[in-house]
């Protein structure tokens, strides 16, 4: 088991063949170490594809001293992706055809629209660049909702996770992305979120409408709902599906599910290309691995 984000001795890090010999079938291993930090973290297997098949979970370490930020209710929001396919089969397909699960490929209609918008020359240069790299600007995620179901605290979108609250409460939501492959764009329509921690470390509070959470990241936010129901909407970065939850004062009341945001496309900047040599071209930026926030000051 790897204790993600926790400072500990190398021998307790849980990486077979590197930090320790591993745990043989039928055997046990006891992890012992002093916890030297507080915050929101998580654990997961480092053996084969065990993480993809469910060996992961949340870790919340309370501080020794009184917390600087006060709240009335505390929820973990564990995001993940699940496939009924054997992970070895998924991996084998990707090795043979990297875009096997990409069902958002460019069409002839897209080509015509791009020519109308940018002209033949720029469209040709753009397509040539991607073809030379044997890639597509729609290659947002290697594995998509074609095989994945996206979960929130183990619940599918059909069921949805439910968090109850009373009017006037300040709620701490500890978002953890324990997915194997998926980035999520998270928002709660009608409700501002104040980010107070990232990867277990306190940050200067900042109010946002949404944020992007990469694989293995954690973000803690504070929300202050009224007596309405709110949807926790975590859409996959490629818009092939979503994880769903509800904050509500009444378990029988649900909020509307919002529409997907537009499907993003990769740009030259995502490939690390020199923008200065491409003046006038459309450089859409995805911001992979970064916290994409709405309504950020400055």
Each language-model region and where it sits:
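Short, aromatic- and glycine-rich surface loops/edge beta-strands on solvent-exposed regions
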Residues: 41-47, 229-238
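A conserved active-site cap/scaffold subdomain adjacent to cofactor or substrate pockets
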Residues: 176, 220-231
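Histidine-centered copper-binding motifs that mark active-site loops
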Residues: 1-187, 191-215, 222, 245, ...
């Amino acid at each position: 088991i790897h204790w993600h984000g926790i400072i500990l001795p190398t021998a307790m890090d849980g990486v077979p063949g590197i930090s320790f010999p591993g745990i043989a079938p039928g055997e046990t291993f006891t992890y012992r170490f002093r916890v030297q930090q507080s915050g929101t973290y998580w654990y997961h297997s480092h053996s084969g594809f065990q993480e993809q098949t469910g060996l992961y979970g949340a870790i919340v370490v309370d501080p020794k001293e009184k917390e600087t930020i006060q709240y009335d209710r505390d929820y973990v929001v564990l995001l993940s992706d699940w496939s009924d396919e054997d992970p070895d089969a998924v991996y084998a397909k990707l090795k043979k055809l990297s875009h096997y699960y990409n069902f958002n490929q460019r069409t002839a209609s897209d080509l015509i629209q791009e020519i109308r918008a940018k002209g033949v020359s720029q469209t040709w240069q753009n397509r040539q660049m991607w073809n030379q790299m044997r890639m597509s600007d729609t290659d947002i995620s290697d594995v998509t909702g074609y095989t994945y179901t996206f979960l929130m605290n183990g619940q599918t979108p059909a069921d949805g996770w439910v968090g109850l609250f009373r009017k006037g409460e300040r709620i701490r939501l500890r978002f953890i992305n324990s997915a194997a492959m998926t980035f999520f764009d998270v928002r709660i329509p009608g409700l501002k979120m104040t980010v107070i921690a990232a990867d277990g470390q306190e940050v200067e509070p900042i109010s946002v409408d949404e944020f992007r959470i990469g694989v293995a990241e954690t973000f803690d936010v504070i929300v202050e709902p009224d007596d309405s129901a709110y949807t926790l909407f975590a859409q996959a970065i490629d818009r092939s599906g979503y994880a769903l939850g509800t904050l509500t004062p009444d378990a029988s009341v649900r909020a509307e599910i919002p529409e997907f945001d537009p499907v993003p496309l990769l740009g030259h900047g995502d490939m690390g290309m020199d923008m200065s040599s491409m003046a006038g071209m459309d450089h859409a930026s995805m911001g992979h691995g970064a916290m994409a926030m709405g309504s950020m000051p400055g």
